[in-house]
Amino acid sequence: MSTRALVTEAPQTLGQPEWSTLAKKLDIETGLFIDGEYVEALQGKRFDSINPATGEALASLAFGDESDIDRAVASAKRAWHAGHWRYMAPRARMTVLTRLAELIDQHKAELALLETLDMGKPITDALTIDLPEVVSTFRYYAECIDKLEGAVTNTARGALHLIQREPLGIVGAISPWNYPLLMASWKVAPALAAGNCVVLKPAQQAPLSCLRLAQLFIEAGGPPGVFNVVNGDGPVTGRALALHMDVAKVSFTGSTAVGKLIMGYAGQSNLKRVALETGGKSPQIFMADLEDLDAAVERAYGGIFDNAGQVCNAGSRLLVHRDIHDAFVEKFVARSRQVYRPGDPLNPATTLGPVVTRAHQQGVLAKIEQGCREGAQLAMGGGEPGGLEQGAYVSPTLFTCVEQGMSIAREEIFGPVAAVQRFDDEAQAIAMANDSIYGLAASVWTRDLKTAHRMVQALEAGVVWVNCFGDGDMTQPFGGYKQSGNTRDKSFECLLGYTQSKSAWFDLA
């Protein structure tokens, strides 16, 4: 039996020794995936994939540069002109993506293990949260394929007007490392469903699961060249993809600063479409009349400490009414210490893994030190957990006595760091929440429906949760206001963004 088969059959109940054994046997693909097969980089460049829990190299991977992006785009262009994918009957394309979803589900243990080793996500989270969401994403967009409809408009007698929806052509997707396969699927699935060809550049820090996904697409019946994956960094590989004259659209998730660069690359090249999902500094607002403080606290710490705080919509700003502030902080600290257990991410009992790299860890710790220098008070955390010095760990951290002008209240940290701020009334809470360059998400906790409705209308965010945080399904558009981006992922709205309309006017007179 192959290593992949062993991993595929691994039950979710495996303990740490079993996962560690499987990790040692795992067959890791190291090439670029172009034209239906793994290939070496043309210039022979390579880079190491590092396990952030141990600091050890997992594998030496091919590094794609401009020449490899050219090769991948050329493969996609050949597939586009051949028409086997874009002209495939909708039901047939649906069958391929449905089969791909089934293969992802069958290989979820292998894919989860790749993500845990690659970026430090606890294996239990990867297996029970991320991978089921990836499967749901491909299934949802498979079901959407035959729902893409055109229109016949009312016109004068003797004329016929048709409006058709067509794919764009070649889509360049640049995905982040925090949810490697899930964030890639939010781009790849709708782009493929609409009939496009795709060149994916996964994050250099965590490309392994995306490389495997491309091979599963071929196994599902996808034509070679329709879906290609090129490893590499942002300044070389990502830039080449965003500048390429044959790419019709770039979809990017990452920092606001890089998003601005990509918009510039579109202007420098062919005015390609640019879809950006960028930074966030999401407020969670807790009104004095909320119904269940314990339940609110449970969701509050999950909103910032899950995935070690490496979430674009992380609820890192905790705006708490003065009347419940002290009780909130006490419960938050007590429960967070009970729930988040740093450790080996291959141990199913671990609930907090490392951050993605040692460099990122040092950046998060520097932000914590800056918060202390600015006068905020540490209520918990503030450094590295003991006994895990070999990995890139950061303890769950909570600041109190935070003022609106402090860096920890304004800058995205992308780590397990939360800041509590007091407010006196609804108007002040809204003003504090909206005082940000970001507008990705927000939440409101109140038992008063009128209050909730007013605040939903007033908050400058693309997603607002009421008495919950992070909930939703594939029907929910996800994206932000202001410098959090200009697009929506998930939902049918996202699918339309990978199409263009064509108007056909017939003179029948």
Spans of features found by a protein language model:
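Glycine-rich loop-to-alpha-helix module at the N-terminal edge of alpha/beta enzyme cores
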Residues: 56-148
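Short, well-ordered beta-strand elements within core beta-sheets of diverse protein domains
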Residues: 58-64, 81-85, 173, 284-288, ...
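Conserved C-terminal structural/oligomerization subdomain of aldehyde/semialdehyde dehydrogenase
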Residues: 1-3, 56-59, 247, 285, ...
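Residue-level signal for inorganic ion chemistry
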Residues: 55, 93, 115, 138, ...
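ALDH superfamily catalytic-core signature
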Residues: 249, 257-403, 432, 466
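Rossmann-like NAD(P) dinucleotide-binding subdomain of oxidoreductase/dehydrogenase enzymes
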Residues: 149-295, 423
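A short hydrophobic/small-residue beta-strand
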Residues: 197-199, 378, 463
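Terminal low-complexity tails and localization/encapsulation signals of metabolic enzymes
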Residues: 1-61, 95, 99, 148-174, ...
